[in-house]
Amino acid sequence: MIHKNAVGKTDPHRLSPVRGPSSELEAHKDSCSFDELPEYAAKVRSIKKEPYFAVDLFSGAGGLSLGLHRANFDVILACDIRNDSIMTHRHHFGGCSYECDLSKRKVINEISEQLNKCGEISLIAGGPPCQPFSRNIKWRKHNEEVSAQHQELNEDRRELWESFISIVEQVKPKAFLMENVTDIAQTGEQEIYRSIINRAEKAGYRINPKLIYAWQYGVPQLRPRLFISGTKINECAPMKWPKPKYDSVEEAVTLDEAISDLPPLTGGWRCEKWDEKFSYEGPKNDYQKLMRDWLDIDDEM
């Protein structure tokens, strides 16, 4: 997060999440099961002449799915291992929100087989969990603060990039987009990065990596991320990266500018009833208007 201190300078802040009890969410009216995925794809094709089908791997609650939706993609399948993430995704998006373990070869093959029954897939996108490559995790390991079980989990996650590439190889979408931490392409981890590039090129993709600072595009976050795009040679033009909106971090959107319109809450807060309301006075700046424009917000929430 970006925060301006008392003298107007910007400081990075790391926030620890505080979780309350989970809430039950109803499924989206256009959601479908994994077995129903080919039928769902056929239904979309009957409505849209040339739909752009996308797949969101390691989807979480659906941040990337929302971006793809706004870019005119139909996200027919989203996969994640966390139940609460999939329940949230299923509430907000149509298509299949599939809870699964993408580290398993059987799961990879099942997903690829189902997608190949759906016709042409325009894009496979996602960010394989990056803890093994993270500087933060390496620092914690150095200080012996990570349990043996956590270390074992991280080593399993080290190979999730391969799950992503394996699905790309089997499904052969027109394009793919992988996001990860920058350390994956730096000293000590370059073997993984080279393997991703080599396998994608061997599968017939033109590769175009890009280091992106989200704050340059209006996101209140300082961490740089590595994006690797691949487009099918002779089928797609190379991906063109958007030009940055900001050149100086002093111009970037701050945390206050992002959420100052929201009512104050304590950690772990959950409403007791869905009809519980609290006062909302509306967005205070252009960024907040942009972030809230897809919500149906009454005078009271």
List each language-model region with its residue ranges.
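Flexible, glycine-rich beta-alpha linker
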Residues: 187-188, 216-219
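Conserved S-adenosyl-L-methionine
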Residues: 99, 182, 205-216
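Conserved Class I S-adenosyl-L-methionine
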Residues: 192-207
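Conserved beta-strand signature within the Rossmann-like core of class I S-adenosyl-L-methionine
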Residues: 174-178
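A cross-domain feature marking catalytic cores of carbohydrate-active enzymes
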Residues: 128, 180, 209-211, 247-250
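Core alpha/beta nucleotide-donor-binding catalytic domains of modification enzymes
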Residues: 24, 28-36, 40-172, 182-186, ...
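S-adenosyl-L-methionine-dependent DNA methyltransferase catalytic core
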Residues: 1-55, 59-73, 199, 225-301
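Short, solvent-exposed loop/turn segments at the edges of secondary structure
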Residues: 221-223
